[in-house]
Amino acid sequence: LPGRASFFAACDAAEVFTPKPSVKLPVLEEKRVYVTCETGVHNIGSDFFEELLKGALHVLGVPDNYRIDVELVSRATIKEYNAQKRGVDKVTDVLSFPALDYAKPLQPKDKEAARFLLDEFSGLYQLGEILICRSVCVAQAHEYGHSVEREMGYLFVHGVLHLLGFDHVTDEEYRQMRD
């Protein structure tokens, strides 16, 4: 398959902390989660994220008709986005960029705007984009004593919750997000 071998070769050859150009997986069938690898050895595919997305949406009682872009990025890239988008000039583990603004969790401010996010071909709505810093994920997994896969899953679900309007600025918001 064109592009598939080069994707794995680019990711396998990458150093964990060395930025590499983004390479997208070829679209073979309609996916709900599109994964891009910018840096590091990448062995977690879209199926991993799709199962987590389905589970999170099920728990929240949200229909499973969303699509998300996930990019595994370098420390430099996530720091740059954090500074540009949030005004925080430091490295972080995960950033989320929702396609809609929310009044409160699961309630978009402009419900009509959602119709513009529908891909008529697939029937899926674009929920937004999640950036995960792979090297921070690896460091946190070691720090917390669990697998990189578990930490990656936690960061992804955390990002999905942000895409759906959840936040953790106040203690109550934090509790709601954790529940």
How would you label these PLM feature ranges?
Residues L1-G153, L164-D179:
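An acidic/histidine-cluster motif and surrounding catalytic segment
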Residues L161:
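Periplasmic solute-binding protein
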